Swiss-Prot record:
This is Cytochrome b6-f complex subunit 7. It is found in: Cellular thylakoid membrane. InterPro entries: PetM_cyt_b6/f_cplx_su7 (IPR012595). The 4 large subunits of the cytochrome b6-f complex are cytochrome b6, subunit IV (17 kDa polypeptide, PetD), cytochrome f and the Rieske protein, while the 4 small subunits are PetG, PetL, PetM and PetN. The complex functions as a dimer. Component of the cytochrome b6-f complex, which mediates electron transfer between photosystem II (PSII) and photosystem I (PSI), cyclic electron flow around PSI, and state transitions. It comes from Prochlorococcus marinus (strain MIT 9301).
């Protein structure tokens, strides 16, 4: 159970920054 929670948390730690950076880049390119 704990390992499953840890793996899910790791996925979020990786995906959230990628999503934030990707969203910021999209807004930046659309702004141009």
């Amino acid at each position: 159970m704990a390992q499953e929670i840890f793996s899910i948390a790791a996925v979020f730690w990786i995906l959230i920054p990628i999503g934030l950076v990707g969203g910021a880049l999209l807004l930046k390119f659309q702004g141009d």
